[in-house]
């Protein structure tokens, strides 16, 4: 979701780069899989900086990712920029484990900790919005500083190309903190169809994620994050995007208006 945008920005700036992907199909792409460490050498050869995105089909990020990052460090990679989450402190599960390792071992590093992606409305919530006109979460009335993936990517490019290493983490948000009730109202106003938010229990939320193919640990972690949002953990706005990229972050209503057809085309089947 952010990697392609980072690559496009680097290409536009004339900065040499390569994209590590499970299914390389274009120039500049090389085979890479966190579960296949032998592939890493080709992806990392000659690299001075890396943008790190964790696998989304598993939750044991420290065990899987750190050995490859150790190899990257040993092979001359100087700067590490990790995409993590506003919910994960260094040493926490998943990307938090990788955050702690990078901060302890890399000479040049940055960890981006965005709040919830606006693009989640186009992916994990799209089917329920189109078919049932509903968003399901366990966030209650809690608010998030929803952020556009393009703003995260712009911050990642700044971290990769800055003359000086940041050597810290940054909490990234959009310009306003909103509840999912307010998100549903924004969708209703833009799309011209009624969309509502249905509040689930944490366990029911985890069950929905498992039904969509997530492993149990990942599903439970995401559902627990929703409960923390309900308790107010994400009710904040930071100004890191504007300060680090010198551009204002995208507002949710503008994001919805700019992508309206994604929710108004023929409903998804299956």
Give the location of each predicted region:
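A hydrophobic C-terminal alpha-helical subdomain
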Residues: 203-270
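Conserved Rossmann-like nucleotide-binding pocket used by diverse enzymes
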Residues: 30
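Oxidoreductase cofactor-interface core, primarily capturing Rossmann-like NAD(P)-dependent enzymes
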Residues: 1-23, 27, 35-37, 45-47, ...
